[in-house]
């Protein structure tokens, strides 16, 4: 007896669940509550890198919409055709034409939602990638790009446009360099006399000499530096500190001329 009662309860519960499912199905299949078919996908790296990634889902959606539209077109019991059909045949033809036109307008209003992913950045997912791949196939390119191409910053797709590159800096020409100062004979004589007196000028002495000769302080400073370098290179005499460091192996910058080296050899 207990087993029979348990089986009867199971049958009643199944019947109640079937009734609830049958009551919910018309709501889900209503035109206002259009439910898209859901497909479980395995998001492995191999699947994502394939060119046909995301195309199957959109194909199922278009098939569902086509089947749904065909059912509506072949539905004989329409509220508008049933009411007008009892009056005049001409009006029936006009009403069927207007109703079909309204359905076409609804379909056209739904169609612009598909190519929206073509103009937006394609890093949103498989749906945007599938729409882009379909558009490429329609244009006749015959090239399928995988999903990861649209998530890279520098992609070779045509929609990315020309790449912006930083302009290269022009190499400094010789004309941009500061020209050498052409000293007059009087200025050279005065500079040589000052150099013989003291090879190193103080700041005050350099300022006064610049005012007397009509030169810049930097010009006088550079002339003195060059003059000291020439004498040092010609004489080959090393500084005492340099000799001390060379003895310890801490200084090996040779400042002697090639002639001195050849003579020593």
Curated annotation (Swiss-Prot):
Q: Where is this region: Disordered?
A: 1-30, 65-142, 155-180
Q: Which Gene Ontology terms describe the biological processes this protein takes part in?
A: anterior/posterior pattern specification; apoptotic process involved in morphogenesis; axonogenesis involved in innervation; cell fate specification; midbrain development; midbrain-hindbrain boundary development; midbrain-hindbrain boundary morphogenesis; regulation of transcription by RNA polymerase II
Composition skew (Polar residues), residue ranges: 75-86
Q: Which Gene3D superfamilies match?
A: Homeodomain-like
Write out the entry's keywords from A to Z: Developmental protein, DNA-binding, Homeobox, Nucleus
Q: Which family does it belong to?
A: Belongs to the engrailed homeobox family.
What protein name is recorded for this chain?
A: Homeobox protein engrailed-2a
Gene name of the record: eng2a
């Amino acid at each position: 007896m207990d087993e029979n009662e348990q089986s009867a309860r199971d049958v009643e519960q199944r019947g109640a669940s079937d009734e609830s499912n049958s009551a919910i199905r018309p709501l889900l299949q209503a035109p206002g509550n259009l439910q898209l078919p859901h497909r479980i996908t395995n998001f492995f790296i191999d699947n994502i890198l394939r060119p046909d990634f995301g195309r199957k889902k959109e194909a199922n959606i278009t098939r569902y919409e086509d089947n749904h539209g065909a059912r509506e077109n072949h539905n004989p019991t329409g509220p508008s055709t049933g009411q007008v059909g009892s009056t005049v045949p001409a009006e029936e033809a006009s009403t069927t034409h207007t109703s079909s036109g309204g359905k076409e307008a609804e379909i056209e209003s739904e169609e612009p939602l598909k190519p929206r992913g073509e103009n937006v950045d394609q890093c949103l997912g498989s749906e945007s990638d599938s729409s882009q791949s379909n558009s490429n196939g329609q244009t006749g390119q015959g090239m399928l790009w995988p999903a990861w191409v649209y998530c890279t910053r520098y992609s070779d797709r045509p929609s990315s446009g020309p790449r912006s590159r930083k302009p290269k800096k022009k190499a400094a020409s010789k004309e941009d360099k500061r020209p050498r100062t052409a000293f007059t004979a009087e200025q050279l004589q005065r500079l040589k006399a000052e150099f013989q007196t003291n090879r190193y000028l103080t700041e005050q002495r350099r300022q006064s000499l610049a005012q007397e000769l009509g030169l810049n302080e930097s010009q006088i400073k550079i002339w003195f530096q060059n003059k000291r370098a020439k004498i040092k290179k010609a004489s080959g005499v090393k500084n005492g500190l340099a000799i001390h460091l060379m003895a310890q192996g801490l200084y090996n910058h040779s400042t002697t001329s090639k002639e001195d080296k050849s003579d020593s050899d």
